[in-house]
């Protein structure tokens, strides 16, 4: 077979000289869309596949990634970064007048929003430490720090997906329900947390739930004390 890109003769699915695919079809709307996504975000069908697997089978995704079966999956940090950008885009949309989305926010909140991607990635170690402590009796030592860091990056994507579901509610819900909206969001965030915890450390429901709640408390403590102390000097 002759490569259409460099003219090298080769066998297989890819040219061993320039990496061009063996089968290059005509340009279509689908191919243009795929190239556009890949060019702007460096995202292709692995983005959709990884996100879907993260929602439906997080245990299989983490198992595959940790055991080296990574072909076809998008790496956790780029996946998290892309979803952060998507969340920021929708988070800046204002809804109906008087809705939660139109409320004035504090300087601390504004700073967090402006640096959301960096902050999300930077707080992953707090999540890792909380999980290692809360699930130590469930065998948390079986995974190393790097595996936990990348696994928690995937978990952070689940939180972002939940936020994307809740944002439209803030566009229409009256601002007087802000506290209820916040508490509801916190309670719902336990669902992906428990789902991920059970995927890594399967056990009885109440045992996993208790450890999950303990991990959440530890994470909030670490984030408030350590994260708050580091962030405060940068807030105007």
Can you say where each PLM-predicted feature lies in the sequence?
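Membrane-proximal intrinsically disordered regions of secretory-pathway and membrane-system proteins
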Residues: 1-236
């Amino acid at each position: 077979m002759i490569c259409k890109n460099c003219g090298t003769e080769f066998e297989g699915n890819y040219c061993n000289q320039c990496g061009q695919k063996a089968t290059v079809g005509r340009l279509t709307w689908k191919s243009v869309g795929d190239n556009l996504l890949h060019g702007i975000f460096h995202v292709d069908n692995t983005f959709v596949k990884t996100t879907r697997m993260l929602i439906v089978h997080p245990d299989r995704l983490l198992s595959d990634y940790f055991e080296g079966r990574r072909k076809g999956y998008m790496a956790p940090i780029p996946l998290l970064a892309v979803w952060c950008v998507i969340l920021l885009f929708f988070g800046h949309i204002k809804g109906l007048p008087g809705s939660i989305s139109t409320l004035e926010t504090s300087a601390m909140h504004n700073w967090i929003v402006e640096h959301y991607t960096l902050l999300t990635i930077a707080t992953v170690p707090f999540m890792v430490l909380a999980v290692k402590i809360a699930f130590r009796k469930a065998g948390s030592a079986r995974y190393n720090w790097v595996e936990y860091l990348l696994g928690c990056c995937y978990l952070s994507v689940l939180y972002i997906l939940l936020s994307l579901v809740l944002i439209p509610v803030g566009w229409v819900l009256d601002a007087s329900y802000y506290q209820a909206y916040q508490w509801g969001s916190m309670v719902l965030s336990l669902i992906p947390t428990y789902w991920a915890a059970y995927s890594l450390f399967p056990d009885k429901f109440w045992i996993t739930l208790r450890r999950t709640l303990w991990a959440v408390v530890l994470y909030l403590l670490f984030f408030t004390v350590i994260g708050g102390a580091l962030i405060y000097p940068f807030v105007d």
